[in-house]
């Protein structure tokens, strides 16, 4: 079946829209679908996503499509960019409408709610083994990507041909550098864990602990990510790349990050509900914390920072008490014997 579009993007929030803008700016005919018909009608009329990316005009190659069946019929390349807690639901909706030659990539960062499973497992449960799968991950703020500011990301998947095609589709010499990676598991995990650590970094700064504490937290957060990744069979080197260290540093240090701002509010004394309300958009790290904590417990992986953040978010511990507990842990070597 011939494509009438080069790629269809499912998810018209800030990041989905930004990726669609980037693709269309590359000259690729791009369809953008969202679940809210009223929102989609507004996007089509305004030629801009005023709700999430105000003032950034849509390229001519970007088309708004409110009908999911039409959106999925237009292209065999499908990019899913929805919150992790509805990832499986969106795939369920899409499944009967997918083309037989469909190829699925997602930029969703997170794990399955309650179980802590990787999204590749969710996708396989819903879609079976029929379709090539891939994940896009790395240090990307939606606004900067949509504005065309230089950005770099990584992509990995189950099919090398699909991965290479995505590199060609996404890469732009002027705005977006894309690295191929063969660690499908590692790329997915980095996007979830960095959200958790970013909340911790925000809490630390909100309390007023300073740059030393923030840097220590980021560094030890990277250790926790690597431990968990290795337990799942990921390549430790992945976490020194875009989807690991890159995304971790970005999210922990810049206030464009909702997760960091959420942590800042908590550190300054807000309760969880008030802090979430202040952000006004989905704070993926809130759910991710429970998911990552659940996964770590199931695998027997020590993640003390994640555990303390979990206790703040779900058990009512104060950020100050969480910090005290981390600082009073038993002394140990930074390079334990293997």
Curated annotation (Swiss-Prot):
Its main location: cytoplasm. InterPro entries: 6-PGluconate_DH-like_C_sf, 6PGD_dom2, G3P_DH_NAD-dep, G3P_DH_NAD-dep_C, G3P_DH_NAD-dep_N, NAD(P)-bd_dom_sf. Signal peptide: none annotated. Gene3D superfamilies: N-(1-d-carboxylethyl)-l-norvaline Dehydrogenase, domain 2, NAD(P)-binding Rossmann-like Domain. Sn-glycerol 3-phosphate binds at residues 109, 138, 140, 194, 247, 257-259. The active site is at residue 194. Its EC number is 1.1.1.94. It catalyses: sn-glycerol 3-phosphate + NAD(+) = dihydroxyacetone phosphate + NADH + H(+); sn-glycerol 3-phosphate + NADP(+) = dihydroxyacetone phosphate + NADPH + H(+). NADPH binds at residues 14-15, 35, 109, 142, 258, 282, 284. Pathway: Membrane lipid metabolism; glycerophospholipid metabolism. It is an enzyme of class 1 (oxidoreductase). It is found in: Cytoplasm. Pfam families: NAD_Gly3P_dh_C, NAD_Gly3P_dh_N. Keywords: Cytoplasm, Lipid biosynthesis, Lipid metabolism, NAD, NADP, Nucleotide-binding, Oxidoreductase, Phospholipid biosynthesis, Phospholipid metabolism. One of its GO terms (cellular component) is cytosol. One of its GO terms (biological process) is glycerophospholipid biosynthetic process. GO terms for molecular function: glycerol-3-phosphate dehydrogenase [NAD(P)+] activity; NAD binding. Belongs to the NAD-dependent glycerol-3-phosphate dehydrogenase family. NCBIfam families: PRK00094.1-1, PRK00094.1-2, PRK00094.1-4. Catalyzes the reduction of the glycolytic intermediate dihydroxyacetone phosphate (DHAP) to sn-glycerol 3-phosphate (G3P), the key precursor for phospholipid synthesis. This is Glycerol-3-phosphate dehydrogenase [NAD(P)+]. The lineage of its organism: Bacteria, Pseudomonadati, Pseudomonadota, Gammaproteobacteria, Alteromonadales.
